[in-house]
């Protein structure tokens, strides 16, 4: 656990009481700090172009196949840079033949290239995080009783009080578990699953007291309440039972329910509470706090790396929770959060496993592939904030350094997957017909997984079992899982979600957990 992170568990009633204490004016203290720079995304984007000496960027492809600049979906044109960087060759040309050479030499080289050119570096001066449990509640997920905790991780802002960062996380575990349980941390909204409601008698008292208070503030409300005697300011949250129409299919339960029913827990962490998902927010959030409200430098971290840092801080808390099996915590996300989940698993070796959903460019997709989403998609004003500023160089058509493209990248996504080895890495996609767009390049992501296989094998893990060269390897059929090794692949028949693969992920991961598989990494 990061020894800079201080963990605190406080009674939620004390927190509520403190909220009632008048705040001490801090205007005089804060006036000595320069205010954060207020850039639009376009202004911040231009600022980075100026720093890099970029005069013009190539336009990214359109997802509309009828547009003049539509993305390529012709496989014969998809591999303009067919030869990938070899993850098992050192920068000096020497081959990596042992695990020791990988851990001590090659892996650090890949990490350096990834940090400098693609995702950005973690600053050395990131403030500490203090976790507080705001609510502990006994609830139900489906028909399973659970213990749910709502937490906030406050980032120390004493170095720059003008920016506040409070990480939102919810942790839910089965109430009747016999011991600590595996937990899947999921990027998404942090909400309690089904908060316990007061009985009707108590709810009536709450409403009566609330009506009295409202009438005291505004006497005219008395007549309104008398006109509508059945109205309650706080309605019951108990949902009425709705019978299912005969003949309609039974809907699949949500992923969180599937996890709980299999004896797992989950933690929902809100990325927006860590770093905003836009370029205008780069002088705010954790990136802005560390930079004291100033714009980024070219190798500073982007939002994907910031979200992954927040997930690691969430893991700091989970390591202190006796209900959590902290040695078996995974990370999950879909789409942009699938990118973040893969980045998290690659850089934070304490995570035992990852479910990487529909991650596309910047995630599992090979950047060197000319198919759908491209490097240029991530260098424009809409998505550049996910990456390090330096990544914009690879979309440049005119610059002081000339021009660069995806073929100039020192690394590619197969090496990001390789950084996860030998830990459990499950690559998940759906099908275009159901909404998991061709844009994501399912084939290119599969090729990346195949190209990462040698690293898994070198480190004593089992790979996908694909023997073909990554250049010619073809995806297995839909709903055909490659689930025998620590590196796994499955394309389900649903849309832009990993929900249909969650039950397969759990069974696959349980196999290794039950076998007491311990990845041989420096973290262990």
Give, region by region, the residue ranges found by the protein language model:
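Short beta-strand element of the alpha/beta-hydrolase
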Residues: 168-170, 179-189
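Cap/lid segment of the alpha/beta-hydrolase catalytic domain
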Residues: 185-320, 360-370
């Amino acid at each position: 656990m990061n020894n800079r992170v201080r963990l605190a568990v406080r009674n939620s009633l004390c927190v509520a009481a403190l909220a009632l204490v008048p705040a001490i004016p801090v205007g005089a203290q804060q006036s000595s700090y320069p205010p954060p720079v207020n850039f639009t995304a376009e202004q911040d984007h231009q600022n980075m172009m100026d720093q890099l000496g970029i005069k013009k960027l190539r336009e990214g492809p359109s997802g509309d196949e009828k547009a003049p600049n539509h993305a390529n979906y012709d496989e014969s044109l998809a591999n303009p840079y067919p030869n990938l960087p070899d993850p098992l060759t050192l920068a000096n040309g020497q081959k990596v033949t042992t695990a020791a050479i990988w851990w001590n030499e090659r892996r650090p080289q890949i990490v350096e290239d990834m940090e400098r050119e693609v995702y950005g570096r973690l600053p050395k001066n990131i403030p500490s995080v203090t976790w507080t449990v705001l609510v502990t509640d006994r609830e139900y997920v489906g028909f399973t009783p659970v213990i749910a905790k709502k937490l906030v991780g406050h980032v120390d802002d004493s170095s720059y009080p003008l920016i506040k960062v409070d990480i939102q996380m919810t942790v839910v575990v089965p109430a009747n578990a016999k011991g600590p349980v595996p937990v899947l941390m999921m990027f998404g909204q942090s909400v309690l699953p089904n908060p316990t409601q007061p009985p009707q008698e108590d709810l009536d008292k709450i409403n009566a007291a609330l009506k009295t208070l409202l009438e005291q503030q505004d006497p005219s409300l008395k007549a309104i309440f008398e006109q509508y005697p059945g109205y309650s300011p706080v309605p019951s949250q108990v949902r009425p039972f709705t019978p299912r129409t005969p003949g309609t299919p039974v809907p699949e339960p949500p992923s969180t329910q599937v996890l709980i029913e299999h004896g797992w827990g989950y933690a929902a962490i809100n990325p927006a509470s860590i770093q905003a998902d836009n370029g205008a927010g780069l002088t705010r959030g954790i990136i802005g706090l560390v930079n004291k409200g100033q714009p980024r430098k070219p190798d500073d971290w982007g939002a994907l790396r910031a979200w992954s840092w927040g997930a690691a801080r969430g893991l700091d808390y989970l390591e202190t929770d006796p209900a959590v099996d902290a040695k078996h915590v995974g990370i999950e996300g879909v789409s942009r959060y699938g990118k973040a989940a893969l980045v998290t698993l690659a850089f934070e070796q304490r995570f035992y496993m990852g479910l990487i959903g529909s991650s596309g460019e910047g995630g599992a997709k090979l950047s060197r592939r000319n198919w759908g989403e491209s490097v240029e998609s991530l260098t424009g004003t809409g998505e550049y904030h996910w990456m390090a500023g330096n990544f914009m160089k690879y979309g440049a058509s005119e610059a002081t350094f000339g021009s660069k493209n995806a073929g100039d990248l020192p690394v590619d996504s197969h090496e990001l997957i390789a950084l996860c080895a030998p830990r459990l890495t499950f690559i998940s996609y759906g099908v275009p017909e159901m909404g998991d767009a061709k844009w994501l390049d399912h084939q290119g992501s599969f090729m990346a997984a195949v190209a990462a296989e040698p690293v898994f094998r070198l480190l004593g893990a089992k790979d996908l079992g694909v023997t073909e060269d990554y250049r010619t390897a073809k995806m297995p059929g839909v709903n055909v899982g490659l689930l025998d090794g620590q590196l796994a692949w499955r394309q389900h028949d649903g849309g832009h979600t990993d929900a249909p693969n969650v039950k397969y992920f759990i069974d696959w991961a349980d196999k290794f957990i039950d076998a007491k598989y311990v990845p041989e990494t420096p973290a262990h």
